[in-house]
Amino acid sequence: MQSIGSIMNVGMNAIFSRILMSNAGIATFGVYFKVQSIVFMPLFGVTNASMSIFAYNYGARNRLRFKKAWKMTLCVTAIIMSIGTLLFQLFPQQIVSLFDSEGKITAEGIAAFRIISLHFPIAAASITISVTFQAIGHGIKSMFMSILRQLGVLLPAALVLALVFKSVESVWWCFVIAEFSAVTFGIISLTKIWKHEIEPMPDGAAV
C-alpha cells in the first residue's frame, strides 16, 4: 500500500509540473500530504483496532456483536473525519501558514484544503468498509478499494481535470471523485456480502 502512495505522489507532482507548470501546486500538495496524516492517523488507529474485533466476532459467528462493533466504528470514524473537515474548512490559512511563512502558496493552499477536506467524511466510510473486507476474508476487495481511492481513479481524474479546466484548483476535486468511486464500490460489495455472510450468522449474545 505504501507503493501506491508513492506512485500517487509522483503522478500528482507530474501533473502539476508538466501539464499545469505550477510550482505552487507542487508545494501545496506537499503541505497537504504532510498535514493529512494528522487527520488520518486517529482514523487508522480506530479502524485497525476495530478490524480485530470484526474478525473475532465474524469467526465466532456472533452477528449482533459484529454489527454493534461495525456501527460504532463507523460513527467514531465519521466524527473524527467530520472534525478534520471542519478544521480544514474553518482554519485553512492558519494551517497553511505553518508551512508557508512567506505566504507564497497561502491562496492556493486555502482553496486546496477546503476542496480536498470534503472527501474526509466519505473516507471514514471507505476505510471502515475496507478494513471490514480484510477482517472477513475479502482482502482483494479491500486492496481494490485502496487502489481506486489512491491511484486508479484519483490520477486519471486529476489528469482529466487538469487538461479540461487547466487550473490547479480544479485538480483538487480528484480526491472527492476518487473517494466517492471507492465508497460506491465498497457499499455495493459489502451490501451483497452482508446479505449472504453476515445476516445468516446467529445472533449470539447481545452485549
Predicted features along the sequence, with ranges:
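Alpha-helical transmembrane segments of multipass membrane proteins
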Residues: 1, 5, 9, 36, ...
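Structural signal for membrane-spanning alpha-helices in multi-pass inner-membrane proteins
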Residues: 2, 13-16, 44, 88, ...
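Helix-terminus/linker motif at the lipid-water interface of multi-pass membrane proteins
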Residues: 7-32, 38, 56, 94-103, ...
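Small-residue-rich hydrophobic transmembrane alpha-helices
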Residues: 10-13, 28-86, 90, 123-145
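Short alpha-helical transmembrane segments in multi-pass integral membrane proteins
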Residues: 54-119, 161-207
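C-terminal structured "cap/appendage" subdomains that terminate the fold
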Residues: 125, 129-155, 159-166, 171
